[in-house]
Regions:
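Accessory nucleic acid-recognition modules appended to NTPase machines
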Residues: 1-163
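Short conserved micro-motifs at the rims of enzyme active sites and ligand-binding pockets
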Residues: 107-110, 167, 177-178, 213-215
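Cofactor-binding loop segments of dinucleotide-utilizing enzymes, especially the Rossmann-like FAD-
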Residues: 147, 205-206
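Active-site ExK catalytic segment of metal-dependent nucleases
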Residues: 162-174
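Active-site-adjacent loop/helix micro-motif of nuclease/hydrolase catalytic cores
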Residues: 172-183
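Arginine/glycine-rich "motif VI" loop of SF2 helicases in the C-terminal RecA-like domain
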Residues: 183-197
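Short, hydrophobic beta-strand segments that form beta-sheet elements in well-ordered domains
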Residues: 196-205
Length: 226
């Protein structure tokens, strides 16, 4: 019953896109929307235009993607280093579905799989979608921090000119190095993060609430507390 209802909702979204998209962009908006499962099924969360269609470019799909974002059909997460540069934002982009349940349907996985604690690309995608959904509801603007191929903090949340860094781990044995790398960069002069505005760091985990020297551990289910 629930999967059927979720699929009906996804079909309605697709129908709305076809009907309401600006003239001449409906096909591109549909293709962008339909590429979301493919975007989520890879290790890197960075949006790849070639997964929309062969030969697809940011120039062609920038306007359709922006329309999906502005109409609340997807949740964007930009590279913090891009600032207000719209062109760069469209290149260094993470894109999430607006609902965790719809995400499971898009990826064709049963909801109970999320409770197994299994490390998988699908579980990671659904976890990040859940967190993005919670943070948006709490009024944060989403971005992420990256130091090239060395480290990435998936969520750098901003509100009232302050930033909060959030990483997560699905299983207790996963190592947490990204927050510490970000912390260490705070003491470097050449930084890729607005360090003077970095207020707090959190690790979302299966563990209970706990304080570490440089960050706070919060259970994943309590992401709304941040």
């Amino acid at each position: 019953m629930v999967p059927d209802t979720q699929q009906k909702l996804l079909d309605l979204f697709l129908n709305d896109i076809s009907t309401l998209a600006p003239k001449g962009t409906a096909r591109y908006c549909r293709n962008s929307w339909l590429s979301i499962p493919s975007q989520l099924e890879k290790t890197s969360r960075k949006f790849q235009y070639t997964r929309i269609a062969k030969g697809a470019t940011a120039k062609t799909y920038q306007e359709p993607l922006q329309w999906l974002i502005q109409n609340g059909l997807v949740l964007p997460c930009h590279d913090n280093r891009d600032g207000e540069n719209t062109a760069r934002q469209q290149i260094n982009l993470h894109l999430y579905p607006i609902d965790t349940g719809l995400c499971t349907r898009m990826l064709k996985i049963p909801a109970y799989q999320l409770l197994t604690g299994e490390e998988s690309i699908a579980n990671t995608a659904c976890t990040e979608t859940f967190l993005a959904q919670q943070f948006i509801q709490n009024g944060y603007t989403l971005s992420y921090w990256s130091s090239g191929n060395q480290a990435e903090v998936p969520f750098l949340l901003s509100k009232n000119n302050h930033f909060i860094a959030v990483d997560y781990r699905i299983t207790p044995h996963q190592k947490c190095r990204n927050l510490m790398r970000l912390y260490n960069i705070r003491h470097q002069t050449d930084s890729s993060c607005p360090l003077e505005q970095l207020k707090q760091m959190y690790l979302l985990s299966t563990e209970d609430f706990k304080s570490k020297e440089h960050y706070q551990i919060v259970p994943v289910y309590a992401a709304f507390c941040i």
